[in-house]
C-alpha cells in the first residue's frame, strides 16, 4: 500500500449515530480539525432522505461547537453536481461534512463530477473532510454499496461501488458492531486481500492523518488485515461460508493510533500532563535517595519488613494470653427460643 491519504487535510470516517446532545466528542474533534473558531464548514446531506431539517441540525451543532460559518449544499443529481452554484461554497471551505443516508445515492451523484473533484481539491489544500455512516463509506476508493449483516463471511454478501478515493487501499464500513457487519467486511477482505478492512462503531471516528489512523469516540475501530490470508473466495459457491485463515485482527478503542503503512499499533493512551510527569520523576528521585540512605546504614529494606512481622506476632501472643486469664461466666448464655441473641448456626446457614 503506497499511499492511504491524498492530501494534508484530516479525514473523519464516523460510524454513524454520533453523539449530538451530550459530550459531542466526535463532532468537536471535527470542528477543531476544520479550524476551530475559524472553521467554515459545508454540510452535504445528499445521501439523506430527510428534508432541510438535517442541514439545520448540523448547522446548529457546528455553530454551538464554535465554527465560524456553516452552510448546506445539496446536489440531488449529477446535473446539480456539475453546476457551479453548488460547487462554489466548497472553494473556501475548511471543512466538508457528508451526512448519513443512502450511500449508493451519494456515490451516484457525487463521484466523477465537478462537485466530487471540488471535495477532493478542498482536502488537498488542507480542509478536513468527514462523513457519518454513508458519508464515511464514500471516503474510500472502494465503498460498500449495500450488503447483509452477520458474523460469518459468505460469498456475495455485499456489493462494492466506487468512492471518492480519499482513503486508498482500504474499505470503510460503519455501524459496525451495532449492526453486526463483521461478516460482510471480512468477506470483502477475503476476496480482495490487498484492501484493509476498517469497521467503525457508532459514535466513533477513524481519523486519517497521513499514514496514521487515530480513534476518537465511544466505541472502537476494527481492522482486518488480510495480507497473509488463505481463502477460498475464488471458487466458493453463492452464500457459502468463506475460508478466512491468517487474518490479523486489530480492535482499537479511543486514543489508539495505528500505522496504516506497516499495519501495526503505534500507541495507545494519552501521556500524563507535564506537571504529573515532573511529580513522578521527583517521587522516583526520593525513592532512590531513600534506598541509598538505607544501604548506607547497612540495613536492608527486608529487615524493616521482618521487624514489623515480629512485632505483629508479639502483639497476637499478648492478646491470646490476656484472653486465657479472663474468669469464666457462671451461667453460660444459650440461644434459646426466648433469647435476644441470634442462633449463629441458623444465621450462617441463612447467608450461604
Model-based region annotation:
Residues 13, 71-73, 97-98, 129-132, ...:
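General beta-strand structural signal in soluble alpha/beta enzymes
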